Amino acid sequence: GILPFKQVGIQVIEDQELIPVGSPIGIYVKTDGVLVVGTGDFKREDGTECSPCKYVLKSGDYIRKVNGETVTGKEIVLTLERDGELLELAVTPEKDSTGKYKIGAWVRDNAQGVGTMTYIDSQGHFGALGHGIADVDTSMLMLMEDGTLYETNIVDIKKGTTGTPGEMTGMIVYSNDHILGDITSNSSKGIFGNCNEKALAMGTREPLPIGLKQEIKLGPAQILCTVDGSAKYYDIEITALHLD
């Protein structure tokens, strides 16, 4: 007789080693366009309320282009990205109570913060955070044009509690002398990019082989973290796993 065989796809992952870091970093990210975080009302010259962008713009839109001219009361066309699709929408600015033209949109074009560099690989690439950079108002992953890593001094650490994550507060000096590298990607798994010589000097520990998520077990483990000025290993306990 004939025995049927089921075909199964197999993905082979090459052995890879990464240098663990655990040092704090300052992060600056410029958005790919101007992020719309909301719309709002304002008063016209006659005191009545208006909101030109209401029902036109949505939180999470990225404005890519405007007319490129001085804003007047004439209709303007905004080129924006929404859910991966480019759109052209018209808005007519209104004069506010001070005589300035507005469209009634709250926008943001950058994000800053502090985090932890997770690893450096043999090609000088880094991975950091372990989660993406999301906008604080929309909670959406930010579309990034470019970004920069900086040195930072941690001035305060708040311990996490159940339902509330811990927090690091740091001081960042945004100057060329303090740059550690450039950020090329912002994803749900973290931020990634390239290290300069100063950042490579942070990778002084021996490389470790990467592990697959299926290899993670409940029980004692260690994390590498900077709490008092230098990166050290700390004992932890893994009490639950969510692999999906």
What are these regions (language model features)?
Residues 2-15, 73-105:
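PDZ-domain C-terminal substructure recognizer with occasional recognition of PDZ-binding tails
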Residues 44-50, 64-66, 103-104, 209:
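Second-shell loop/turn segments in exported
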Residues 63-65, 77-79, 222:
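Hydrophobic beta-strand signal
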